[in-house]
Amino acid sequence: MEGFNPADIEHASPINSSDSHSSSFVYALPKSASEYVVNHNEGRASASGNPAAVPSPIMTLNLKSTHSLNIDQHVHTSTSPTETIGHIHHVEKLNQNNLIHLDPVPNFEDKSDIKPWLQKIFYPQGIELVIERSDAFKVVFKCKAAKRGRNARRKRKDKPKGQDHEDEKSKINDDELEYASPSNATVTNGPQTSPDQTSSIKPKKKRCVSRFNNCPFRVRATYSLKRKRWSIVVMDNNHSHQLKFNPDSEEYKKFKEKLRKDNDVDAIKKFDELEYRTLANLPIPTATIPCDCGLTNEIQSFNVVLPTNSNVTSSASSSTVSSISLDSSNASKRPCLPSVNNTGSINTNNVRKPKSQCKNKDTLLKRTTMQNFLTTKSRLRKTGTPTSSQHSSTAFSGYIDDPFNLNEILPLPASDFKLNTVTNLNEIDFTNIFTKSPHPHSGSTHPRQVFDQLDDCSSILFSPLTTNTNNEFEGESDDFVHSPYLNSEADFSQILSSAPPVHHDPNETHQENQDIIDRFANSSQEHNEYILQYLTHSDAANHNNIGVPNNNSHSLNTQHNVSDLGNSLLRQEALVGSSSTKIFDELKFVQNGPHGSQHPIDFQHVDHRHLSSNEPQVRSHQYGPQQQPPQQLQYHQNQPHDGHNHEQHQTVQKDMQTHESLEIMGNTLLEEFKDIKMVNGELKYVKPED
């Protein structure tokens, strides 16, 4: 083998075995770099033939245990002059397995055989390799610039042929030598014999670095002392320029001449075809192999698998692993490349996270249960059906256990539901919205159970939002609304205490009944006209049935009370603002039995007929001794059977007459409620047309 062989270090001086942590290898270097190049070009003698005759300096390389060779990684991490101590931590942080290891690599006899082998692989891809720096154990190749400056082209045209030949020789030295010294060193083409020859030779200028020739692509070849083999790693597979095969370059011509000397017929045929396709502007076929990860493609060139070089970057300032002396921030931004043999590696550049779908908030709001809850009112107005069938919807019965229908107290239009629709809920009273009304036969003594039979009547009379097609009010038996007038047990106790006793004077009984009627009139602020009409009928009926002689005086008092009541109702009606406060809550009519027992009056089983002015007199004589009303039979059953005297019979007649007066009042109200209609969300009394 010609030239320097790293295996010759075995013939060096003996190793100092006293130091167990480090090994010192002493070997002889050539005289100078120029002699090494001349001998390498002319088929020179081996430098290891006579190491003692060469007066060369001795270089000692210390390999510590922490920087020992790793057979699994196939990478030798020796310290170079550019890898200073301040940048060692960057090298340790790098994962060497992420680099692209070329495999299989032949057993090179000399490091000069590495470049032709790499050129045969990378030339078909449009990559022209030159040596960036080289030493005994490592050679770094870079991608040569595709363009040159205009001044360099002009100078090259003006130069004579002899000077151009000298520039080519200096160019060879520039490509194959390492600039270890930062000072302006002089490079000669021959041995250094005299100082006159040294002064006559001009110093070589370094090649200018621009954005056209600063490509981050690097290939590193390192020699392993243990394995006695070379390992080649692609450290950065990015390029700052477009890749294009150039058959007219000087490097390619030298490479082609080397192939002819080696008699590599197959490689010559492939490159001849490559030249023809390039000159004819034909596409260059590449043997593409999909990667195991499924994200990248690979190229097989001369039995070596490489990743594609399609990721060409436009920036020329990206750093590499080999140039660790550059800015550390740029080195940290360099992307790690996947290994060819590593099947678990994934190229994260091609992985894209799926975009999250943009959700429409209006669509989500329309799916809420509040929309179905509020649109019941609008559907009811169109169809005219009661809310009993629409009440058992899944949007409402899923989380509320009470059968109470809230649509009857929410007069909010919900055709287009939004959050700003329900803005003010202070007008609605949700006091007992989630409390069920107890069963009437449960046996409890709660004050509400006394009036359970009248709940249906009150819901029918005062259901403002439940109407049918004829604008008649309907109500359910369990729909019970509490009003601000009768919402406590104290109001019930006042009504119970105001009932007439068993034995009482007829005049006092009539006065107390009048007070009850006044209480009822004060609690109703909407129906002043028909209440005034009813008071006239009830007053005439009571005087005709009881037979009081002072009818004229009492009628005057009644008319005076009626006028005062009408004025008070008109004043109170002007103070009412919203329709929700105008809803009647409860209407209870109580009658005491002969022994103080309280009996609710059922208005559902009576004849609902409109009473004329003379009808109370007919109704007073309707029931005779042969035909008694149902309430009178009930009172006879409650009386003791030991005897019936004349006083008890008169008391029963008085109670019956009082009961009939209350019954007439209830029937009249039921008939008069048909004249109440909903106008602009409010209850209005409409006079019947004659």
Swiss-Prot record:
Q: Which gene encodes it?
A: AFT1
Q: What extra comment accompanies this record?
A: Present with 2730 molecules/cell in log phase SD medium.
Upper taxonomic lineage: Eukaryota, Fungi, Dikarya, Ascomycota, Saccharomycotina
Listed Pfam families: AFT
* A biological process from GO: negative regulation of transcription by RNA polymerase II
Sequence ranges of Low complexity compositional bias:
621-638
Activity regulation text: Dimerization via the binding of Fe(2+) or a [2Fe-2S] cluster decreases the DNA-binding activity.
* Binding sites annotated in the UniProt record for DNA: 111, 115, 131-135, 138, 226, 263
**Entry binding sites for Zn(2+) 1:** 110
Q: Where is the composition biased (Polar residues)?
A: 181-201, 339-351
- Which stretch carries the motif CDC [2Fe-2S] cluster binding motif? 291-293
Q: How does it assemble?
A: Homodimer. Dimerization decreases the DNA-binding activity.
Give the compositionally biased regions (Basic residues).
Answer: 148-159
Q: What does this protein do?
A: Transcription factor that activates the genes for FRE1, FRE2 and FET3 in response to iron deprivationand thereby plays a central role in iron homeostasis. Also required for the expression of LSO1. Recognizes the consensus iron-responsive element (Fe-RE) sequence 5'-CACCC-3' in the promoters of target genes. Iron could interact directly with AFT1 and inhibits its activity. In high iron condition, the presence of Fe(2+) or [2Fe-2S] cluster leads to dimerization, which in turn leads to a decrease in DNA affinity.
Q: Which residues bind Zn(2+) 2?
A: 143, 215, 239, 241
Q: What is known of its domains?
A: The CDC motif is involved in iron-sensong via binding to Fe(2+) or [2Fe-2S] cluster, which leads to dimerization and loss of DNA-binding.
Q: What cellular component terms from Gene Ontology apply here?
A: cytoplasm; nucleus
Q: What is its main location?
A: nucleus
Q: What happens when the gene is disrupted?
A: Two-fold reduction in expression of LSO1.
- Please give the residue ranges the record annotates as the region Disordered: 1-21, 148-205, 335-357, 612-655
Q: GO molecular function terms here? A: cis-regulatory region sequence-specific DNA binding; DNA-binding transcription factor activity, RNA polymerase II-specific; kinetochore binding; metal ion binding
Please state what the protein is called. Answer: Iron-regulated transcriptional activator AFT1
